[in-house]
Design a protein with these regions (language model features):
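Local beta-strand N-terminus motif with an aromatic residue
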Residues: 9-10, 38, 88
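Glycine-rich, basic loop-to-helix element that forms the pyrophosphate-binding segment
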Residues: 70-86
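Short aromatic/hydrophobic "clamp" motif used to bind/position activated sugar donors
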Residues: 91
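Acidic donor-binding segment of Leloir-type glycosyltransferases
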Residues: 27-69
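N-proximal low-complexity "stem/linker" segments adjacent to membrane-targeting elements
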Residues: 1-32
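The conserved acidic donor/metal-binding loop of glycosyltransferases
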Residues: 95-98
């Protein structure tokens, strides 16, 4: 496979709100993709079920993951916040319960 520096950076924005039961599988799927030049932006929208802590744990394991914690503002605000920090040439959204 090509060096990731020659491939375009893809930003993946994942809104997260109380999805602890699904989040690990979602993040394993994203992190396990064969395309490696990814920026994974997790927007924790004030989760109270441990989802935010799980986001932090994954960020410690994988340097491509950025976590933003905020008070609950809704999925549209999460997506907009992710767009504001995304640096990729290409962009995608993944729902955390996918």
């Amino acid at each position: 496979m090509e060096n990731t520096e020659t491939l375009p950076l893809i930003s993946i924005i994942v809104p997260v709100y109380n999805v602890k039961n699904y989040l690990e599988k979602c993040l394993q799927s994203i992190c396990g993709q064969t395309y490696k030049n990814l920026e994974i932006i997790l927007i924790d929208d004030g989760s109270s079920d441990g989802s935010g802590e799980l986001c932090d744990l994954f960020a410690q394991r994988d340097g491509r993951i950025k976590v933003i914690h905020q008070t609950n503002a809704g999925q549209s605000a999460d997506r907009n916040r992710g767009l504001a920090v995304a640096q990729g040439e290409l962009l995608g959204f993944v729902d955390s319960d996918d």
